[in-house]
């Protein structure tokens, strides 16, 4: 059956037929592919994880479509070496095999860091959501992103209340471009210092007391959190651009509180 199939006339390539609307497409490709990758780990050299991957290229106005299967073929080609130091090469391959001028690669993945409880010194793994966003046109561009959970305690509530203050878990999202390599662990540590207290996956009673009291002595609005992150990121000479967001999932309000700052070294 296979031999008979191969004898048939070659199949037409519909994607390469001309499109008469003359409208170019900025991004077209495949989205949400689950695939294993390797991430550099500060303490253990590397870490294996699973990423959700998006791959896009541009499409000239005269082509009807792109070749979707080639994106997955490229992933399989680099299946043993999908890592940060290979992203530019993968993007270059995408441009070559898909006849594109621009290529984009996005990855979101869980990254685990061993954390030590502040008093008991109990160790546990903490999960963080990280992103790699890379593109290649005339030059290579890369953005590292991390979502860092922290605790925030409201300064206004502390000032007004006779008994404690409302506090909640918050998510700080930071994205950076850099001129020299930055460890994920170092960026996490910097951002965790911007809330009222870090978050831990394992706390004993003595740790809970310490963390609760630390947050109470260090109240922060979302405004404080993004400003503090800005001060710390601007002090890092290898950071050329960054954006930082803070979202408090308010414990006594129906809404969330939000703040964001974006800066580049040039500005």
UniProtKB/Swiss-Prot annotation:
Pathway: Cofactor biosynthesis; 7,8-dihydroneopterin triphosphate biosynthesis; 7,8-dihydroneopterin triphosphate from GTP: step 1/1. It holds the Pfam family GCHY-1. The record marks 154 as: May be catalytically important. GO terms for molecular function: GTP cyclohydrolase I activity. Its EC number is 3.5.4.16. It catalyses: GTP + H2O = 7,8-dihydroneopterin 3'-triphosphate + formate + H(+). The keyword Hydrolase applies. It is an enzyme of class 3 (hydrolase). Transmembrane segments: none annotated. InterPro entries: GTP_cyclohydrolase_FolE2, GTP_cyclohydrolase_FolE2/MptA. Keywords: Hydrolase. GO terms for biological process: tetrahydrofolate biosynthetic process. Converts GTP to 7,8-dihydroneopterin triphosphate. NCBIfam families: PRK13674.1-1. Belongs to the GTP cyclohydrolase IV family. HAMAP family: GTP_cyclohydrol_B. This is GTP cyclohydrolase FolE2. The lineage of its organism: Bacteria, Pseudomonadati, Thermodesulfobacteriota, Desulfuromonadia, Geobacterales.
